[in-house]
Regions:
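Residues in soluble alpha-helical coiled-coils and helical-bundle/repeat scaffolds
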Residues: 36-40, 44, 62-65, 82-83, ...
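Helix-turn-helix
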Residues: 2-40, 44
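Hydrophobic/aromatic-rich alpha-helical bundle segments in the mid-to-C-terminal region
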Residues: 105-109, 113, 128-174, 181-199
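Hydrophobic alpha-helical connector segments
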Residues: 44, 55-88, 140-144, 168, ...
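Hydrophobic/aromatic residues within well-ordered alpha-helical segments
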Residues: 38, 45-49, 53, 111-115, ...
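Recognition helices and adjacent regulatory flanks at domain boundaries
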Residues: 3-4, 18-19, 44, 48-50, ...
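Solvent-exposed, amphipathic alpha-helical segments
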Residues: 2-10, 56-63, 90, 94, ...
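Amphipathic alpha-helical segments used for helix-helix packing
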Residues: 70, 82-106
């Protein structure tokens, strides 16, 4: 969507209806007639996000098959909007609006809740298919969402490698202890230290 693409390139202060119109290939008057204000345009763009979450997760399931692979790859793909520090800064600027403006906050809360619910479903499937140990999947879904957000901000500060690689490593690190046979798969140096600590 033209609005979403421009939000990655322009901050809320810099974004104009003319920018979005040019990206969409229409004249600004068309957007002014339809939306009236920039705020209304942004609200319209954001309102579609919560309802699209189940479909997004379903498409990823069909693509990757494995519940855990689906989870990791989908979170990585969804970080594409902030693949540069500049795009991340723009995203954080829009997040400020989401936290202050009640209408935007309601949409953001609904989107976050939908993502957490779909993440839990993937974790439930991962347990059922013996990819994960039995665990509190609701709590793990919460942790995944928190690690995802924290890792993205962490990467924007350290700027080592790509965001995709940084995020994948963070999510896999969180999930590692929950995998079946996790201790057996740990690096030898680490398992050696664990054995020495037991003596």
């Amino acid at each position: 969507m033209a609005t979403t693409r421009m939000m990655q390139r322009r901050s809320p202060v810099d974004l104009t209806l003319a920018d979005v119109a040019k990206e969409a290939g229409v004249v600004p008057a068309t957007l002014i007639q339809r939306f009236g204000t920039k705020r209304s345009l942004l609200l319209a763009a954001c309102r579609t996000a919560p309802g699209g979450v189940p479909e997004q997760f379903g498409a990823a399931r069909a693509k990757y098959g494995s519940p855990l692979k689906t989870l990791i790859e989908l979170y990585v793909e969804c970080s594409g909007f902030a693949s540069t520090p500049e795009a991340m800064a723009n995203g954080l600027a829009y997040l400020q609006i989401d936290l202050i403006d009640p209408e935007f906050h309601a949409i953001t809360l609904a989107q976050f809740t939908a993502i957490r619910d779909e993440t839990k479903k993937l974790l439930d499937d991962a347990v059922a298919s013996d990819e994960l140990k039995p665990c509190d999947t609701a709590d793990l879904a919460r942790l995944i969402q928190q690690v995802n957000g924290g890792a993205m901000l962490d990467w924007a500060v350290y700027r080592k490698g790509s965001l995709a690689a940084w995020l994948r490593r963070s999510l896999e690190g969180l999930l590692a202890p929950y995998r079946l046979g996790a201790e057996a798969d740990l690096p030898k140096a680490r398992t050696g230290r664990m054995q020495n600590n037991r003596r």
